[in-house]
């Protein structure tokens, strides 16, 4: 099959990539390729879900078609994750600030240990930013985070495996470019956000997703509030493995119920505002998703697990005698117990760990249509 066309570069004005030995990992030798299972259906949405006693099939290595909704000449490539490994781990407790957290630095320590001991990520190929360090380059300021994100993806080659983990405060800001169905962009807060400002999902997508070549894997774990679309990945999957679509019918019922309630209370202004808001949302919802799909797809293999939906908060938890982020803890725990899971099994395992303890619902999203019954690799 012919090679996919190069992804069109789009300029952005962010800080230059980090330089110096601190951000210069040594070369990582390619690991031996594991035996390949038979390739699933190219799109794979209806391939049978593997049982717990059955090893899920590995990702196919031929170029895949995006299908409906994406530019017709685009193809994407799954990564075998046999090449170089690099990781960026960010944990911010906001020490000494009014909104201080407790578990984020612990999250980074636990995730880095897991990557090193179980996933063959070398310490010298990790950049760790936490706000308890003395080295100014290791503090998770806005500038350091942006520079480290550029370091992470610099010179990435097909079958490389990149990993980013963020544990800290997240939030929402009004969307300015029309690519969000709910009218808000997701943001993360650096330790110096009060003076430097937040980092928007559009910005992170431009730095870490847009430049990647076909076959490069970026695995992202965002353990923060309102993190559902923190990388602006257009394909979102439910626990049944189906592609999620905006549920305007459900939202219509909720908004019209609010309008009826306003009328019953004699609040005609409230009724008018609610009705207008619904019809505006119905009009832009589909176009916002189409804009996201058309502009935020990627031929690379980008997969993200986020701590909550866009509208939800994420919780700290207390496990094994220390504070931790709920998603960070559940992600490591489920993979340590069952390392060979499909994407769908992993999402359900994470949700099962949190169910009954927290209201948040971790999300799975991807830069391309994903066969969720394939083996999760990174």
Swiss-Prot record:
GO biological process: apoptotic process; proteolysis
Enzyme Commission number(s): 3.4.22.-
Cellular compartments per GO CC: cytoplasm
EC primary class: hydrolase
SUPFAM superfamilies assigned to the protein according to its UniProt record, in alphabetical order: Caspase-like
Family the UniProt entry places it in: Belongs to the peptidase C14B family.
Active site, per annotation: 169, 225
Feature: compositional bias, Low complexity: 10-29
Disordered, as annotated region: 1-70
Sections of the chain in a coiled coil: none
Gene name of this polypeptide: casB
GO molecular function terms noted in the UniProt entry: cysteine-type endopeptidase activity
Functional description taken from the UniProt entry: Involved in cell death (apoptosis).
Record protein name field: Metacaspase-1B
Keywords from the named record: Apoptosis, Hydrolase, Protease, Thiol protease, Zymogen
